[in-house]
Curated annotation (Swiss-Prot):
Its job: Ubiquitin-like modifier which can be covalently attached via an isopeptide bond to substrate proteins as a monomer or a lysine-linked polymer. The so-called ufmylation requires the ufm-1-activating E1 enzyme uba-5, the ufm-1-conjugating E2 enzyme ufc-1, and probably the ufm-1-ligase E3 enzyme ufl-1.
Quaternary data: Interacts with odr-8; leading to deufmylation.
Originating organism: Caenorhabditis elegans
Gene: ufm-1
Disulphide-bonded residues: none
Name of the molecule in the record: Ubiquitin-fold modifier 1
């Protein structure tokens, strides 16, 4: 699991650093959301920020483990840490 240096829990919020792996420059966004936010909403927002299609994108950990977005953001944070990667579908499996 990732170290929590970029993550802070202020009140009931969790912070994620999401990196776009399909761009060689590896741009990232730091998002803070309430723990109860559905992670599907976090995925959709991050994909829109990177201008990639949310419906065909996946979130993985830095270790390459897929993340099931059908759970609250707080659960994702506890299980996988704060550093995640966004992969557009055309890159999944590459």
């Amino acid at each position: 699991m990732s170290g929590g240096t970029a993550a802070t829990t202020a009140g009931s919020k969790v912070t994620f650093k999401i990196t776009l792996t399909s761009d060689p420059k590896l741009p990232f966004k730091v998002l803070s959301v309430p723990e109860s936010t559905p992670f599907t909403a976090v995925l959709k927002f991050a994909a829109e920020e990177f201008k990639v299609p949310a419906a065909t994108s996946a979130i993985i950990t830095n270790d390459g483990v897929g993340v099931n977005p059908a759970q609250p953001a707080g659960n994702i944070f506890l299980k996988h840490g704060s550093e995640l990667r966004l992969i557009p579908r055309d890159r999944v499996g590459h």
